[in-house]
Curated annotation (Swiss-Prot):
Interacts with CIB1; the interaction is direct. Interacts with the chaperone BIP/HSPA5. Interacts with RIGI. This is Interferon alpha-inducible protein 6. It is found in: Mitochondrion inner membrane. Interferon-stimulated protein that plays an important role in innate immune response against a wide variety of viruses. Inhibits flavivirus replication by preventing the formation of virus-induced endoplasmic reticulum membrane invaginations, which are double-membrane vesicles that flaviviruses use for their replication. Plays a role in apoptosis, negatively regulating the intrinsinc apoptotic signaling pathway and TNFSF10-induced apoptosis. However, it has also been shown to have a pro-apoptotic activity. Modulates innate immune response mediated by RIGI by preventing its activation. Keywords: Antiviral defense, Apoptosis, Immunity, Innate immunity, Membrane, Mitochondrion, Mitochondrion inner membrane, Transmembrane, Transmembrane helix. The gene is IFI6. Its main location: mitochondrion. The keyword Lipid metabolism does not apply. SUPFAM superfamilies: MFS general substrate transporter. It comes from the Eukaryota. PANTHER family: INTERFERON ALPHA-INDUCIBLE PROTEIN 27, INTERFERON ALPHA-INDUCIBLE PROTEIN 6. GO terms for molecular function: molecular adaptor activity. It comes from Bos taurus (Bovine).
Amino acid sequence: MRQKAVSLFLCYLLLYTCGCCEEEDEKRYSEENSDSSFWGMVTYMAVGGGLMAAALPMLGFASTGIAANSLASSLMSWSAVANGGGVPAGGLVATLQSLGASGGSALMAKIGAFLGYTVHKQVESRQKESKEKK
């Protein structure tokens, strides 16, 4: 269980750092095109939740097992080669397969919605900072 939590936390950190906006993105948003805070938040949460819920099956971690010729099968192969012929229990591939087999898409959707909310708050705070600088 601890390894699943660590894996999910690492995924969160990876996605959190990728969600930061650049200055060009700030310029793209103008005051006329900005949404209200609530609807903007709902949009980010829906997109984040939808993408994360679809991520496991799209990568090949399905409820029936790892799909052939998918990224999941490549990860499984690399993991087996790196660990002397077997996929380690509790490793990244095993954890993602467990989430895919047990309906972890609902959990991933919740994490994605939380990440969407976090990205929305970052975008909103950066917009406020850029307005204050002007």
